[in-house]
Amino acid sequence: LATDESLLADGLYFISYFDRNNIALDNKGNVRWYTVKSMPSNNLLRLANGHFVSSAVAQSGYLKMYEFDMVGRVHAMYDLDNACHHSLYQQSSTYAYKGVNNCLVAASEYMPGSRPDGGLSIEDGVSIINLETGEEIDYYDMVQVLGLSRATRPSNPPDTANGTLDWLHINQAYINETNNMLITSGRNQSAVFGLKVGTYDLSFIMGTHGDWPEELSRYLLTPLRADGTPYDLTDPIQAQEADAVFWNWGQHNVLEIPNATPGIIDISLFNNSNYRSRSDANSVLPQDNESRIGHYRINLNTMTVQMLAEYTSGAEGYSSLCGCKQEMPNGNIVVSFGGALFDSNGLPLTCDPGYSDVALEPGNGDVEGRLPLREMNAEGVILQDMTISSGLYRNIGNIPPSQTGFYRYNITCFRMYKLPLFG
């Protein structure tokens, strides 16, 4: 725990455990607030009016979204046409989408069997929702943007029962208001990409250049080193270096760093860092890996991207499936490595061996979920470091057959913020 609380940002740590509870901890780790199981806990977001909004799998498979306040009063319930399965983002009050203010941007998907093209792809859409009426103003089907030909990296285990295809796995979307551009993060393509709002016109793709269809290659951003010189990606050594130390892999929580300059988009992201390569031979194993926080600047005029800053976690913070961070008004950074897994000897593990990382683990078969939570200053000095664990080691040998596919998912945190008790 922090030795000098005066260095910490104000507020409580609000943590949303996937399909468990939302809780708030003070700087000593004491629980100061929580919601009961009947309230959704997954993609918790505090709105400008001080209320929270969230959807979860327990609430009709993400098809019911609740707006509730700090004392548990439900102010609105949204019956959704498309499931809002990952991050939610409220645009500023001055931004109007097709003449509508107070809009929510949500990672979403067509319900099974309802795709207009009859396809089986999932978690590959973005919904724009009017928070005043609950109406879905627009839906972006990203199959029409990126296609389905590129292999996933990382991925989820195949859905053998239903045959669905989680080829993109959108986990965050928001509108960059300066450039009127929809920014979207796709975990299973390790890509962040931008569309002109209201269209399917692609503007850029941020991610490793390997294996993209030729027709999309002109949208790939060129990576720049800290001194402004570009990586030469025709050189295999430099391309491998960029994969290992520069590019985003399995990223989450892609959010804007304010910059009002037209043609410039600054973002921060939680770089899970799965694999760090499109080839197994060059991939980093979970026990040698770490998740990172990256701050990047995208220049749409030069089609380049440069890393402005990076914060690393060490092996104790490697999270193969989720994670989030927040920049505080005092310059501190709060981060949750929300999908960290370890065996009983402390060896970092991955959530889905062979899919989320290379299937090579020398562990003892035990798995415990842990949620390392940190607050750092702007220089990366750790001021607060606490870990919440499931308190339970699972082993595939003592798990019922019906649960073997998910036995590693015993505690995860998709969203965490440091906020005042009342907004």
Language-model region placement:
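Histidine-/acidic-rich catalytic cores in large beta-rich domains
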Residues: 1-423
